[in-house]
């Protein structure tokens, strides 16, 4: 896979997101401008300008009508994708570490940082939409506020499950927690990692999710039972991971801490995207093209490409080639052959 390099950020990347159709990529970084790109050729479509601090997170709704960003300037902003204008801005008590539209598009989740004697929280804002999915109203107050639970470290990342039924959060002490998506009631807390949870990304149907951690492990977890389905062990701290559609793979990225990068070579730093088989839990390949840690990895909903954002300030866009789709273990080839035999017998 030969990558397309997207150059539009002056500082490190913080998040990369595809829209539902997979034709646009939204990126945010530690500079104060977010970017929108064509996923086919990497051409920049436009920028979202209006923040006064680092943009820690970005998301786009299911209809690609609106994008949302969370920033270190104590604000959450909603943008009109068609022209890059600001539709609304909510002020927050502390910097915003993660934002995400609910699957239904009527709520926005934001993770607030634990600074200035504030313990941190997950807050939910609600919006009103018409029949054409246009937002007609923004509620100024909070729809829900989930404070840091007693006995837990602050939340770093959070995401919605299917239909917005649950909010799943990852904590600084390695725990994960599950909350009622409407009331904010804490439903379950689980000790999962030995170090902070760096990312949570759901499957396409949002029934299970992948956690990554700086303890070099990633876990596949069922959202209903909260049971660990699979565990992936790597040789470096992880910053992000995603679940691929079409193929039964997960992609993991990370590397040595950015502050230690100058003391080692790129090869020793493990600045790679690692491909693991989702079911067999074994590594099947690596892509090494960043000059620093991989901060975020996202795969297109169609499963035909993935994008990675790095500490080096670049986004690498990879379109999967034929060998990716053709790859199968012997047991998978045998199963496919048996299916053909069974079909022929009928």
UniProtKB/Swiss-Prot annotation:
<dbReference type="GO" id="GO:0071541">
    <property type="term" value="C:eukaryotic translation initiation factor 3 complex, eIF3m"/>
</dbReference>
<keyword id="KW-0853">WD repeat</keyword>
<keyword id="KW-0396">Initiation factor</keyword>
<dbReference type="GO" id="GO:0003743">
    <property type="term" value="F:translation initiation factor activity"/>
</dbReference>
<protein>
    <recommendedName>
        <fullName>Eukaryotic translation initiation factor 3 subunit I</fullName>
    </recommendedName>
</protein>
<comment type="function">
    <text>Component of the eukaryotic translation initiation factor 3 (eIF-3) complex, which is involved in protein synthesis of a specialized repertoire of mRNAs and, together with other initiation factors, stimulates binding of mRNA and methionyl-tRNAi to the 40S ribosome. The eIF-3 complex specifically targets and initiates translation of a subset of mRNAs involved in cell proliferation.</text>
</comment>
<dbReference type="InterPro" id="IPR001680">
    <property type="entry name" value="WD40_rpt"/>
</dbReference>
<dbReference type="InterPro" id="IPR036322">
    <property type="entry name" value="WD40_repeat_dom_sf"/>
</dbReference>
<comment type="similarity">
    <text>Belongs to the eIF-3 subunit I family.</text>
</comment>
<dbReference type="GO" id="GO:0002183">
    <property type="term" value="P:cytoplasmic translational initiation"/>
</dbReference>
<dbReference type="GO" id="GO:0001732">
    <property type="term" value="P:formation of cytoplasmic translation initiation complex"/>
</dbReference>
<dbReference type="GO" id="GO:0003723">
    <property type="term" value="F:RNA binding"/>
</dbReference>
<feature type="repeat" description="WD 4">
    <location>
        <begin position="192"/>
        <end position="233"/>
    </location>
</feature>
<feature type="repeat" description="WD 3">
    <location>
        <begin position="150"/>
        <end position="189"/>
    </location>
</feature>
<dbReference type="InterPro" id="IPR027525">
    <property type="entry name" value="eIF3i"/>
</dbReference>
<dbReference type="GO" id="GO:0033290">
    <property type="term" value="C:eukaryotic 48S preinitiation complex"/>
</dbReference>
<comment type="subunit">
    <text>Component of the eukaryotic translation initiation factor 3 (eIF-3) complex.</text>
</comment>
<dbReference type="GO" id="GO:0071540">
    <property type="term" value="C:eukaryotic translation initiation factor 3 complex, eIF3e"/>
</dbReference>
<dbReference type="GO" id="GO:0016282">
    <property type="term" value="C:eukaryotic 43S preinitiation complex"/>
</dbReference>
<keyword id="KW-0677">Repeat</keyword>
<feature type="repeat" description="WD 5">
    <location>
        <begin position="289"/>
        <end position="328"/>
    </location>
</feature>
<keyword id="KW-0963">Cytoplasm</keyword>
<dbReference type="Pfam" id="PF24805">
    <property type="entry name" value="EIF3I"/>
</dbReference>
<keyword id="KW-0648">Protein biosynthesis</keyword>
<dbReference type="GO" id="GO:0034399">
    <property type="term" value="C:nuclear periphery"/>
</dbReference>
<dbReference type="InterPro" id="IPR015943">
    <property type="entry name" value="WD40/YVTN_repeat-like_dom_sf"/>
</dbReference>
<feature type="repeat" description="WD 1">
    <location>
        <begin position="8"/>
        <end position="47"/>
    </location>
</feature>
<feature type="repeat" description="WD 2">
    <location>
        <begin position="50"/>
        <end position="89"/>
    </location>
</feature>
């Amino acid at each position: 896979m030969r990558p397309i390099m997207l150059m539009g950020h002056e500082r490190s990347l913080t998040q990369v997101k595809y829209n539902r159709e997979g034709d646009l990529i939204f990126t945010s970084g530690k500079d104060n401008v977010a970017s929108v790109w064509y996923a086919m050729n990497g051409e920049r479509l436009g920028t979202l300008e209006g923040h006064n601090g680092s943009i820690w997170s970005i998301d786009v709704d299911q209809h690609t009508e609106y994008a949302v960003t969370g920033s270190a300037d104590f604000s959450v902003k909603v943008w009109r994708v068609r022209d890059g204008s600001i539709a609304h801005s909510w002020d927050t008590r502390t910097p915003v570490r993660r934002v995400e539209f609910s699957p239904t598009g009527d709520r926005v989740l934001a993770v607030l940082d634990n600074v200035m004697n504030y313990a941190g929280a997950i807050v939910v804002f609600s919006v009103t939409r018409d029949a054409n999915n246009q937002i007609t109203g923004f509620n100024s107050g909070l729809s829900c506020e989930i404070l840091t639970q007693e006995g837990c470290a602050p939340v770093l990342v959070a995401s919605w499950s299917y239909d917005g039924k649950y909010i799943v959060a990852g904590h600084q002490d390695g725990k994960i927690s599950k909350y009622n998506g409407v009331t904010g009631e804490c439903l379950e807390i689980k000790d999962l990692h030995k170090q902070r949870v760096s990312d949570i990304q759901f499957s396409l149907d949002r029934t299970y999710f992948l956690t990554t951690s700086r303890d070099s492990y990633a876990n596949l977890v069922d959202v209903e039972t909260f049971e660990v389905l699979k565990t992936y062990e790597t040789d470096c701290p992880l910053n992000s991971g995603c679940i691929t559609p079409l193929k039964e793979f997960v992609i993991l990225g990370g590397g040595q801490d950015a502050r230690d990068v100058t003391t080692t070579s790129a090869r020793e730093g493990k600045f790679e995207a690692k491909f693991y088989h989702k079911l067999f839990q074994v590594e099947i390949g690596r892509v090494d093209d960043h000059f620093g840690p991989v901060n975020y990895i996202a795969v297109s909903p169609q499963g035909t490409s993935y994008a990675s954002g790095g500490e080096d300030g670049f986004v690498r866009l990879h379109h999967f080639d034929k060998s990716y789709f053709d790859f199968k273990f012997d047991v998978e080839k045998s199963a496919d052959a048996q299916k053909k035999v069974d079909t022929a017998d009928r």
